[in-house]
Amino acid sequence: MEMASAFTLNVRLDNIAIITIDVPGEKMNTLKAEFASQVRAIIKQLRENKELRGVVFISAKPDNFIAGADINMIGNCKTAQEAEVLARQGQQLMAEIHALPVPVIAAIHGACLGGGLELALACHGRVCTDDAKTVLGLPEVQLGLLPGSGGTQRLPRLIGVSTALEMILTGKQLRAKQALKLGLVDDVVPQSILLEAAVELAKQDRPSSRPLPVRERILAGPLGRALLFKMVGKKTEHKTQGNYPATERILEVVETGLAQGTSSGYDAEARAFGELAMTPQSQALRNIFFASTEVKKDPGSDAPPAPLNSVGILGGGLMGGGIAYVTACKAGLPVRIKDINPQGINHALKYSWDQLEGKVRRRHLKASERDKQLALISGTTDYCGFAHRDLIIEAVFENLELKQQMVAEVEQNCATHTIFASNTSSLPIGDIAAHAARPEQVIGLHFFSPVEKMPLVEIIPHASTSAQTIATTVKLAKKQGKTPIVVRDKAGFYVNRILAPYINEAIRMLTEGERIEHIDAALVKFGFPVGPIQLLDEVGIDTGTKIIPVLEAAYGERFSAPANVVSSILNDDRKGRKNGRGFYLYGQKGRKSKKQVDPAIYPLIGAQGQGRLSAPQVAERCVMLMLNEAVRCLDEQVIRSVRDGDIGAVFGIGFPPFLGGPFRYIDSLGAGEVVAIMQRLATQYGSRFTPCERLVEMSKRGESFWKTTATDLQ
């Protein structure tokens, strides 16, 4: 039986051909290699039609044009040559579209990304809708690749080299108005008239290319180009620390096309695409993509979720305000905030106002939309308006008695079906639910700060939590735009438990004489977004270290922090960025002065700050403890799978994505190598480095955590 076509042709009475893109059985249009023959058959018909006046590509999907190429095609390639052939086929198809003798217009609504934008770039003109769903970008770099179907050559010529480089190197997505301003699209229209606007453009002569701004024309010349690529190269190297080979190849390929012409540029693009597809970095980044897609589809339990119509939040502090924002503005649910202090409610409301007003200023949101979203949030100092809330998120102080009191009050003032979700970072959920009348409706829902930016949430059922409560909480997290992992109710849960030994070791090296900036730079070089000591300053030294005694009580000496260091720092009123002084000193708010290490820290903790370890040695000590603890978490079923463990570390603490997460990284090194490193470190620095039993056993048997296919677990 022949596969239904993803591309269908309809020639209108006015001799404008409409090519409708609709991949059968899929929510998103993605380009697959087998579609090439369908498009070529259509191109043949178009060339034979002598009456043809123009062509329009449009999607039948409600919220996407083309979301990119099917990534599985790359995974099926066994060699760089095979991946290069794939790129050349894409380039050839786009060239055939571009070579049509009549105007070809892309009518874009929704996501137009990767191969989708490359198809649109191959057209002679582009019209898109003014809808918030409409975004245009080339995100291949986020998978360790570059655009392989002509994007590196067409985009710089259309919008200018410096703007194109910013898009390709970062994977940045543009909204409709931004795309129009830069010349990426020719018109922005309401969705209701998208097709007709594209048809009108197709009836005109081919749109002439917009003259580039003077600055872009200078930068495209030999002298300007040399300066631009040198400057962008240095900036990119600083940002990536040399860990992402795709960025270097993007610069090389774009420059080749500008200096030697498009033919050389296309050759370089296809060759680089093939080579990058085989790099371990790209394989790891693609694995993370597949894993996160799977997690987003995971319902959390077998039970159907309960309806979610409205949410309550207890506490209007930083976390409460952030949770209210994602609940109202991402999930679109009415939110009622309760705080004992009216100022707390005002703080939470201002938090959402600031976020939304920023979007209005950047023209990402209309003022009317801002007001509509803000109207979903209300506040109270008692339980007025809480009677019919489906789920209450508690975000009060980390105090067990207080949280137990919140459970009792919610059970007294809310409906019998209401779920109580605690945003605790350290207290056992079973203890919070200890006196609950309906313990099956109590669960942990651990957000990370800042709530609107951090993609991960941990969902923590205790022994009596019902399957429906789990499913409903997972459903809410997804509505809020989060990636949820379900973890076991053990001290520290997963993320904080693997983070604590990593930070402890950094502080221990500080007491041994390593410099603050050296430790942080070593872990940034390894691939973390910030170093461990800066992270502690950002989180708040008082907040970040609160969990250490909890973990030490639960798991023993391996979690003990260096004696008296934390207390000495806190006694000196150092809380980190929030009060302007921690390990670093921070300039006054609003000023652009950089943070700088406070040399007074060293005598305060009895350290010299001389240093003798290399950057790789510093990183090794911190990271090995994190890996060991992640394996223990898997062994104790704190996490349900290595997939959740990798996603939790990458999305929760910024574990280097190009390494694929702790379990992928262990597999890449080999369990035997990890055990050997840890045994060496245990001999040098103490028993906290003793490899856990599972790692030792896997080392003996030559086992790995992941199977060879991208999405299968062992």
Swiss-Prot record:
Keyword presence, Transferase: no
Catalytically driven reaction(s): a (3S)-3-hydroxyacyl-CoA = a (2E)-enoyl-CoA + H2O; a 4-saturated-(3S)-3-hydroxyacyl-CoA = a (3E)-enoyl-CoA + H2O; a (3S)-3-hydroxyacyl-CoA + NAD(+) = a 3-oxoacyl-CoA + NADH + H(+); (3S)-3-hydroxybutanoyl-CoA = (3R)-3-hydroxybutanoyl-CoA
Marked site: Important for catalytic activity: E118, E140
Region span, Enoyl-CoA hydratase: 1-190
One GO term of the biological process aspect: fatty acid beta-oxidation
Presence of keyword Transport: no
InterPro entries reported for this sequence: 3-OHacyl-CoA_DH_CS, 3-OHacyl-CoA_DH_NAD-bd, 3HC_DH_C, 6-PGluconate_DH-like_C_sf, ClpP/crotonase-like_dom_sf, Enoyl-CoA_hydra/iso, FA_oxidation_alpha_subunit, FadJ
Primary site of residence: cytoplasm
UniProt entry keywords in alphabetical sequence: Cytoplasm, Fatty acid metabolism, Isomerase, Lipid degradation, Lipid metabolism, Lyase, Multifunctional enzyme, NAD, Oxidoreductase
SUPFAM superfamilies the UniProt entry points to: 6-phosphogluconate dehydrogenase C-terminal domain-like, ClpP/crotonase, NAD(P)-binding Rossmann-fold domains
UniProt EC number: 4.2.1.17, 5.1.2.3, 1.1.1.35
Any one of the GO CC terms: cytoplasm
Pathway it works in: Lipid metabolism; fatty acid beta-oxidation
Cross-referenced CDD domains: crotonase-like
Compartment(s) of residence: Cytoplasm
Region (3-hydroxyacyl-CoA dehydrogenase): 306-714
Gene3D superfamilies found in the cross-reference section: 1.10.1040.50, 2-enoyl-CoA Hydratase, Chain A, domain 1, NAD(P)-binding Rossmann-like Domain
GO MF term list: 3-hydroxybutyryl-CoA epimerase activity; enoyl-CoA hydratase activity; long-chain-3-hydroxyacyl-CoA dehydrogenase activity; NAD+ binding
Transmembrane segments: none
Matches recorded under Pfam families: 3HCDH, 3HCDH_N, ECH_1
Subunit structure: Heterotetramer of two alpha chains (FadJ) and two beta chains (FadI).
Purpose of the protein: Catalyzes the formation of a hydroxyacyl-CoA by addition of water on enoyl-CoA. Also exhibits 3-hydroxyacyl-CoA epimerase and 3-hydroxyacyl-CoA dehydrogenase activities.
HAMAP family, alphabetized: FadJ
Family: In the N-terminal section; belongs to the enoyl-CoA hydratase/isomerase family.
Protein name stated in the entry: Fatty acid oxidation complex subunit alpha
UniProt source species: Escherichia coli O7:K1 (strain IAI39 / ExPEC)
Designated gene of the protein: fadJ
